[in-house]
Amino acid sequence: MNATSSVGASGLMQVMPNTAKYVAKKIGMTSYTQEKLKDTNTNLTLGSNYLNMVLVDLDGSWVLASAAYNAGPSRSKLWRERLNAPVEGAIFAETIPFHETRTYVKNVLSNASYYSGVMTGQTISLKQRLGTIAPKAAIQSELP
């Protein structure tokens, strides 16, 4: 898939070239080249591995991880650090200062709830999926 965003993200998972290079190295994909980012299987592998990396780095929070996937992990961490008290994930999502990221998070997580129900027959409410976001000092990680 040859889809490229205005900021340079490529493929089905819209992975940035530097992020793809980082993830490929981390998962041992020794044959990676930037041209392979256009290959759907490679793109899915890199994008899903990166999403898992940010999910782990952000304590399993789907709200923070989806925001990080779109705007970068350092921004998600900064937004969480600025909280004064724990808030519902929906409230946190509504306070994301970037319109694109705020919309992305809402779309991704509402679709995840819907398709999870379709695929498994078990629904997880959007509120449950969003959880609660508690303040936490931002700790720098190596994730791009």
Give residue ranges: language-model regions.
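Catalytic glycan-binding domains that act on GlcNAc-containing polysaccharides
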Residues: 1-144
